[in-house]
Amino acid sequence: VWGGNVIVHELAQRSDKTLGVKMPVTIRNSFKKYLPVVLENQLGEWQADKAIRGKCMNGFGWARLGELSGNVLFEGTLAWEEGTHAAGLMIHTAGPNLEKWCQLRIEPYHGKIAVERYDQINGDQMYLDERRIRFDKNEAKVQLIVSGNILLAYVNDTALTTRCYSLQDGGIGLFVECGEVYWRDVELKGGEE
């Protein structure tokens, strides 16, 4: 139970007979209002055609996609070039110099997903929000529900739930660290309050 609500996952059996999780269809279907997705390059090289391509070989690059307000579902499929250090989503972005943010980090080399925050070092959180994950073919299906400061992420068949305290609304975007990524089937949807 979290704040009076139960977070529900649907169990799914993997090919090796272990269990994974996925977002229940009823939750996904509650997000019905399509929100605008507009790529705004911030750092690095970003372009959109049939897919969104991001490249930053020597550091951090990111592009803004839209606004977070109320309950929002992000969905997309991420592919990365071999050697890419990290990629993922920028969440609750604020300020002209990215003064506030959370990240859903996908780290292929380390085989994990994690949530990091702008104030993680100097803040009051003394633990890491991360999960081990297996990646196939340099690709991951990403779903993220943002409800106020609650984040519920599904990456392939692994879930990670956390809070970004002191952050509300703001922007949402994509990032890459030392590599090249491709996002396809990117959607933002608003849900019921």
Task: Give names to the regions the model predicted.
Residues 1-193:
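Extracellular glycan-recognition regions
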